[in-house]
Amino acid sequence: RASWHMALSAVAALLLLPAAIQAAGTESREFAAGEPLSSGPGGMSAQDFIEYASVNDEDIHELYFSVILYEGTQSCLMCHQDQGEQALEMGHFKWQGKSENIVRFESGEFGKNQLLNNFCIAVPTNEGRCTQCHAGYGYDHKSYDFTDPTNVDCLVCHDQTGAYAKDLTTAGKPVPGIDLNLVAQSVDAVPQRKNCIGCHAKAGGGDNVKHGDISTDLIATTREYDVHMGTDGGDMKCVACHGTNHDPKDGSVNHGNAGMSLHSVHEGEMKVCTDCHGNQQNIHAGTEAEDMIGPGWHERLACQTCHIPAIARKISTKVEWYWADAGQNVDPIPIDPDTGRPEYDKKKGSFKWENNVRPVLRYSNGKWNRKLIGADDNYTTEPIQLAVPQGDYNDPEAMIYPFKLMVGNQPVDPNTKTILVPHLFGKKSGPNPYWGKFDWNLALQDAAAYTGQDYSGEYAFAATEMLMSVNHEIAPAEMALGAGPSPDGCMDCHSSDYVDWTVIGWTDDPMNGGARVSATPSGLSAGAVRLD
């Protein structure tokens, strides 16, 4: 590429100014292969760069941003205006969307902005901190302009240098000092694992805190920890399964991603195991598992149930979080001896960490019961079920899946029976963030004024539970539950205390004479299914 670099240097004084592009006409020039790049009387248009790069087999982004100063998203929109408009509608930017998988809210528009959880609890009033992982810039208040395409952060998904990073407390702005021109030169249409995992692994405030099956290790892991993403295995990108929607008018990618986390937004069809591997009988033919998988035998087991025997196998995950303990001056901070992670934080309370967490089992038909701010944020009993999959044995669409169970406690109003949102960070949504004043009452007043929640002025801490889908850290076949000759493989599940049979429709382990019973109601405590 030395030839065009020499040509560019000859006209750099002209082309370094964005005005040279803006002044160009709509008609693109014609270039011959090997022709030195030079501007015409009206300057270079974006289309001129595309034409030149195509004729000379050059990377358009590297060429363009070698001579044009990257000035934010508006630089991307010079060529990608349609994509910018599409991105305004994506769940990664709006943090909500068509919620057809949330029971009773299938026709509504909900998502991360409304969901309650028992990690950092909720987004409202805390936008300035949460939006470190927002695919945009400046979302620090509910007044944020979601209609302005220049607010979209293109680089966070398309950077290929690995150097791009968002600052912790600046509402999604990049870390100071990054050479954004080099980042812009590197962009590619297809996000790599680091683009996706860089944000999703940090959900909940740290590496693998929330999901348990999505850690930064998966960026460059081995087949032992994930057969699909391992560099010595499938080496697959996230988008291989989390595919994008396509515009119905012209077929172009419209930035909607299937399989959004937290089962909140439907933006396309997610790849499932059988799309690539075929049905259970075919894939297991000729293996030791062939006799176990068939009509009448384990046909209601989802693939993940056996092929994810444990999560957090390399990087630990948080399994308990107690907000009631926050606000104390603890010194020294206790460190978990097994994981090396802190068990206390004055801002957040006390925690429990684990490696090699065995998922819990529940029937699921793909729908979820969720708690939503202002729509369904009340409770009657404890532990409050914040996220429970829909389905049971009598539901022909439901199968047994693995889930991560998270337990803890968090603020509630004992009088109005409301699961409360606390104002934790920043002062744009109120003057009394808990992480500044450590006064729960003031922080809850701030949030109630901001969200419209019903707060009587009295608070307590209620026990909560939530279940989260487990789909990553697929182990090699030889590590799957049931692998190995019978009866040894059978004992992976059919042994004492491994499975709570009552929640999946049995009086006891069928190998011990258990009988089939009616399905357990969806409201059953998730804790009853923990696999210890």
Placement of each model-derived feature along the sequence:
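Extended, compositionally biased alpha-helical segments that mediate assembly or anchoring
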Residues: 489-492
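Bacterial N-terminal signal peptides that target proteins for export
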Residues: 1-9
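Soluble extramembrane regions of membrane proteins in the secretory/endomembrane system
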Residues: 355-400, 404-450
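Bacterial N-terminal signal peptides
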Residues: 8-19
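Sequence context of c-type cytochrome heme-c attachment sites
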Residues: 23-192, 198-270, 274-294, 402-407, ...
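Repeat-solenoid scaffold signature
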Residues: 269-382, 387-389
